[in-house]
Amino acid sequence: MREILHIQGGQCGNQIGAKFWEVICDEHGVDATGRYAGDSDLQLERINVYYNEASGGRYVPRAVLMDLEPGTMDSVRSGPFGQIFRPDNFVFGQSGAGNNWAKGHYTEGAELIDSVLDVVRKEAENCDCLQGFQVCHSLGGGTGSGMGTLLISKIREEYPDRMMLTFSVFPSPKVSDTVVEPYNATLSVHQLVENADECMVLDNEALYDICFRTLKLATPTFGDLNHLISATMSGVTCCLRFPGQLNSDLRKLAVNLIPFPRLHFFMVGFAPLTSRGSQQYRALTVPELTQQMWDAKNMMCAADPRHGRYLTASAMFRGKMSTKEVDEQMLNVQNKNSSYFVEWIPNNVKSSVCDIPPRGLKMAATFVGNSTSIQEMFRRVSEQFTAMFRRKAFLHWYTGEGMDEMEFTEAESNMNDLVAEYQQYQDATADEEYEDEEEEAEAE
């Protein structure tokens, strides 16, 4: 039933992915050997969304792990849940992509892609009714961005009617891991706009801020950051895996969140975020969850929703709560902050309620919003891109792998178009839309 195939690529993707499987295994009561050690039938009822049941009652994740160098995969394999994955599903090269998008997309990655697709095919054939794919990757490096987008376009060709959801880590505004990040990210966005159905936009700086300010961690590690991401990833699919009063799935999410096909880049948030020591001092209520969930400080990407307007949003609650209260709170948010929602999409917040909360919490909520302010992310990357591209800095690394400058120009203009589209809908009002139509009618 409604399986989701998980794919992780590159160092970032594999580290997020490894953390994600720790969270999912914990929710479904699966131990590090793949045996079920849980205490509730609900954990098993739809465990097959993310797991295959192998011989001897072992649960094996429907996961494909790929990288162009063996390093990160070795550490996944030796990590806490490393033995749970199917050994054949580790696909890796030896050369590395060296933070070069062209290597990941055209040369090194292209050599490895067929063996990855074989594994994907094998996993898809094991599914009863595949719902879609979720891909974890970063856009700043070489493998996750270059090879990740190559894989997405290949899967698109082969499974055109399945959902394609990505968790994409964008380059951060202040912290840069790589000088050529703006190039890699722009080339990737150029692909994601065309080939992905839903992109959850993440970035490390926003995650650091959450760890630092809200969770009060003095020195946040990547492990802490990835744990935040995993909580959100688990929240997005909890309705598929546990019974609930109001269900959502990847396709419902897309239908409710995407008013125009290109505008499918979402901000995500999670509540409750409390610092490790202070959990036991407060009970959570739906109003508190709602308040934290819509808080700008809670967003996992460096764009401020107060600088734009929400086209649509979706709130996924988990735990025992009254749906009436959820509906009231959602209505309340829209009424109080009506200036932050576009008025030409009435009732633009979708909510869903799943009965089973995450481990250790009474209730929780995941937020996914389609806000025009996400253009800040693209605008920032685009400015950095233009600054380097104008001088043709670092281009020889890409042209040397057979890329053409034209492709850079196309990617740049596609990204600028995307920013312009977001801006256009941010400024649009209900009345002027109507006037446009009248003028068109007269012109005809």
Swiss-Prot record:
Gene behind this protein: TUBB7
Tissue expression: Expressed in roots, leaf sheaths, and suspension cultured cells.
Described purpose of this protein according to its UniProt entry: Tubulin is the major constituent of microtubules, a cylinder consisting of laterally associated linear protofilaments composed of alpha- and beta-tubulin heterodimers. Microtubules grow by the addition of GTP-tubulin dimers to the microtubule end, where a stabilizing cap forms. Below the cap, tubulin dimers are in GDP-bound state, owing to GTPase activity of alpha-tubulin.
Keyword Magnesium tagged: yes
Any single Gene Ontology cellular-component annotation: microtubule
Signal peptide feature range: none
Induction: By gibberellin. Down-regulated by abscisic acid (ABA).
Gene3D superfamilies found in the cross-reference section: Helix hairpin bin, Tubulin/FtsZ, C-terminal domain, Tubulin/FtsZ, GTPase domain
Protein name as catalogued: Tubulin beta-7 chain
